[in-house]
Amino acid sequence: MWQAQIFTLYPDFFPGPLNKGLYGKALTNKIWDLKVVNFREAAEDKHKTVDDTPFGGGSGMLLKADILAKSLDENKKEGERIFYLSPKGKKLDQKLALELSKEKSISLICGHFEGVDERLLSTRNIEELSIGDFILSGGETAAFVVLDSVLRLLPGVLGNEQSKNDESFENGLLEYPQYTKPQIWEEKSVPEVLLSGDHNKIKDWRLSQSEAITRVRRPDLWEKYKKN
């Protein structure tokens, strides 16, 4: 069973949408498990303080290393990878999602305010992970993105395992266009090759479409694809 731990100030956010549909069914069937930790509970003062002002001045507040470290130490699993969700981190991609799906468990720390005391990251061997070049108000939304990208790769979660292999990024390319009934809609017809029944021609068409779309929309991916 694949396991995830979420360290957050808002435990009621979870499991949220991950308790619905295929992921909810997989959770019930114990394909994966989720533990949610409110790290505010590690604070011992009357006000349960988890943040403070940064040394050297500056705007905003920082999460305190001592509070988060205590929460992590009380809950971490042996050998698991711990990620702090941050725009400074390594960017999540399909390759990393697949890598994480092969772990036994991961922990995700949902940040708030202006960030976290840097000493926490170095002393607890925490990796920083980003979902993109933009800023969110908190790490919870990013945690959902990470979990969504990983859970669908776990064996037994998707109804059609083959569908994982046909999607964007699986072969280094963006996904080809797809069509369903009706065959003609608003005077636009489905491409004839998809109606031919010739699987080799369909495969070639889909590859050429994926290549063309990737070349125009994601030249960075296209360059990597050409090198491989």
Swiss-Prot record:
EC numbers: 2.1.1.228
Broadest EC class assigned to this enzyme: transferase
Binding residue positions for S-adenosyl-L-methionine: G111, I131, G132, D133, F134, I135, L136
GO biological process: tRNA N1-guanine methylation
Gene Ontology molecular function terms on file: tRNA (guanine(37)-N1)-methyltransferase activity
The entry's keywords: Cytoplasm, Methyltransferase, S-adenosyl-L-methionine, Transferase, tRNA processing
Primary location recorded for the protein, binned into one broad class: cytoplasm
Protein name in the entry: tRNA (guanine-N(1)-)-methyltransferase
Function field: Specifically methylates guanosine-37 in various tRNAs.
Location within or outside the cell: Cytoplasm
CDD domains per record: TrmD-like
Subunit structure: Homodimer.
PANTHER family referenced in this protein's UniProt entry, alphabetically: TRNA (GUANINE-N(1)-)-METHYLTRANSFERASE
Reaction catalyzed: guanosine(37) in tRNA + S-adenosyl-L-methionine = N(1)-methylguanosine(37) in tRNA + S-adenosyl-L-homocysteine + H(+)
Family classification: Belongs to the RNA methyltransferase TrmD family.
Keyword match S-adenosyl-L-methionine: yes
One Pfam family here: tRNA_m1G_MT
GO cellular component: cytosol
InterPro entries: Alpha/beta_knot_MTases, tRNA_m1G_MeTrfase_C_sf, tRNA_m1G_MeTrfase_TrmD, tRNA_m1G_MTases_N, tRNA_MeTrfase_TRMD/TRM10
Source organism per UniProt: Pelagibacter ubique (strain HTCC1062)
